[in-house]
Each structure stands twice: as structure tokens, then as C-alpha cells.
Amino acid sequence: MLFLVISTPAPPRPSEVREHRKNFWPWMQDKLDRGIARSVYPRTGRGAVVTFDVDSHETLHRLLNQWADAVPAEFAIYPLMEPESIIAFLNEDSAAA
């Protein structure tokens, strides 16, 4: 299950959460190394954009709680499809629908 997650950190000053933010990157690197995250990009200013590839909603929920524990944030979550999935869907016989 693919999800695009965009974080918007809580309002404290960046200097107040600097150490927590430093801890985020090793945590995220572990997710990249294990294939749980496919990509991560820091947003200009603060926040990050991550593509997670997880086996369940519960796994995503657990990851977001760990993330928010390290860097308190709000998350926008967008479910995604693999490109080949949408191509297969579009090529299905429309009469079958």
C-alpha cells in the first residue's frame, strides 16, 4: 500500500526542536533501508514529504506516531497507486463495470 505523507511541523521555534529534528533523519534512513519508505524529501523551511510502502493501515499509523513523537507535526496523507495498476484499470473492459 503506497501513501504520500506530507508533514507540517508544530509551531515551536525550529531552534527549540533542533535535536529532535536531527534524530528524525537516522530514523527515516532505517525506513528507507528496509523498503518501508521509498523516498523522502525535506520541505523548504520545515517538514518533509515521504512515500511509504506499507502492508497495512496499522503499520502506517504506527510510523506516523513514531514520526510525531520525534517531531510533532500534522500529516496530510494521500493513498497512491502504482503506475502499472492504473494502466491495467484503464485497459479493463468497460462493459465489465
Model-derived regions: residue spans:
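Conserved, structured core segments of small domains
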Residues: M1-A97
